[in-house]
Amino acid sequence: MIRLEVLNENIDLSDFISQSLNGTIFQNPRFLNYHPENRFPQEQFQIQNFQFFKKNKLVAFLPGRVVTLESGEKVYKSPFASSYGGYVFYKKIKFSEIEEVISLTIAHLKVLGVSEMHLTPGLTCYGHEQGEKENFVEYNLMKEGADVETVELCMVHKVSNEELTQRVDSKIRTELKHCIKYNISGEVEQGVSKSAYDLLESSQANFGKTPTHSFEDLQRICELFPDKIFTFKSYHDGNLIGGIIGFKIQEKVLNTFYIFDAPEHREYKPNHYNYHQVLTWAQNNGIEYVDFGPATFGYTPHYPLIFFKEKFDALPFLKKRYIKKL
């Protein structure tokens, strides 16, 4: 028999998440504390984090919020203001336990007057050798009447001991030689410097976009998780020409959250250099998967992005968003 307990605050569950089957920093309530208190008022965005216990042992956790829309309708969202949400399970979770956890969630949300539940779990590779257990979740959600609303195609490189130059496309090898010719140098920095953020901001502005996080947001995340955020930089003649900001979301998974460069220096191939720099660092630091992020806009493929990431021997994983009407 499993029981559900509600947490109306973002407490630190780092120990449980770090030892779980599939948890990431994105699902850790502590991570969500980087948001300023007034950004999401509790009256409209009520914290509803669910803990599930079996014989006083924490077996599952679901982070989320009940969002009250202008119409008065209530929607439960997991994640809320984060990249991934969904359930975090202890490593020995069984099918019947997942079934009960989902059933308890739905019953509780109905009591709260919630009309819809939105869940976006992590990729199956976040469960490593037991990632297939995510199929238990998908099956039970669909058994309860949930639908897949959107799907994103994420490209992920599985790290091995094989020489990187043998795994990447021949054109990438040529471009990397180009980087050597122009004396491109690299640096791996813990945290995010102002110069790196300024280049990120200007790079995204070229596409009419702004970064998801402000510089202050990233500094706060670095304070909360000082050993989880890295910037991979490339330089030409001492000038910063490109970078990748990576989140170490698990001990063995690196998520390349931001990829950016200076358009006027693209002839030096900073992105090629930085992708290779990230994969080399991953090999040397016990990383098993490098998540290069989405390469689609829902069901619209971003072909150049897919082709580019394929050249770095990236494989496809699906990021699914489920909706269950209550």
Per-region residue spans from a language model:
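Short, solvent-exposed loop/turn segments at the edges of secondary structure
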Residues: 80-84, 150, 317
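Aromatic (often tryptophan-rich) hydrophobic motifs at membrane interfaces
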Residues: 99-104, 220, 224, 228-326
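Short acidic/polar active-site loop segments enriched in Thr and Asp
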Residues: 115-117, 288
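The substrate-binding groove and active-site-proximal loops of carbohydrate-active enzymes
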Residues: 84-94
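A conserved beta-strand-loop-helix scaffold within acyl/acetyltransferase catalytic domains
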Residues: 2-72, 123-149, 154-265
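Conserved acyl-donor/pantetheine-binding loop and adjacent beta-alpha core of acyl/acetyltransferases
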Residues: 67-86
